[in-house]
Amino acid sequence: MTYSIMKLIELMGDQFPLLLNTLLERMPVIVAGEDIEIVDDITESLTTLCPHRHKLVFWRDFTSESEIVSVWEEEKHNYEVSRTIVCGLSGNLRLAMDRISHFAGWILAVPLGFTVLGVQVTESTLQDVTAHVLKNSGNCGLLRVSSPSAITFSLVRPSDSSLDVEKKIVNKILVRKKQSLERIRRLLTKSLRGLDVSNHILTAVLKLDDESEKLTQDVFEEEINNYVHAARRAVTLLSRIRLARELGASTTLTERNLYEAIGWDGGELPDLIQFIRAEWHEDFSDCVKSGALSGLGAWVDSMWGT
């Protein structure tokens, strides 16, 4: 895979947070373009944007809808099992259309201008694929690849997400990467001070492209995992709030108490609730509300031993 996280951020600019949100919420994403190798490369590269999920490749890891449905059923009954992200490559497009009807969590390659198992893939085919995917999906993303360096992304239907979390992740990546690279360059420059080194050698020593890629990857994975772990703590807490309500309690949790309890301070509450719904198949929207609730904060504290 040649499309690193840093490269995707640079190429997509302001569209990257929307793409990241789409993948985190497990909406299907269609990757369409006229270079089959690049389309497949990007399709596989996008799976790295969800480092907490286990990648499955259609026709390599499974070949039928019943198999992937069983994976999803296991997710619903076991919070601890690895969540999945599915990759459908160009050569198996027709098979995917014939065998699959639910594409949540899929990234699907559509090689325009190529023939796949006897089917000529055209813009009309792309429309048919999009319509097929939308039959059982609330929304769908379309990533168009015009050239190796020209990529655009949009949703078929508007999104309600604030994208606050995704924008903060990108901002943290850029800031922390810049700070780390500046520290490294300062140390390297200091170590070479006083030496008779040509500008060519100095430039080569201070060129940190590989380190920049690695730093971006590391910071990105750290920030995504921080969000996932905070959301997982929210699931633990909210499932107990729900149990208390089922036992007759009339309490719900405030947004402030929830965020304090799980150690999270970013993003809008509806975005967190939607991510939990996508990741753990649970809807806790009735368990959290704005405003103060007497005594609940202490009860939440007691759950965590504070």
Regions found by a protein language model. Give the residues of each.
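A eukaryote-biased sequence property
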Residues: 48, 56, 62-306
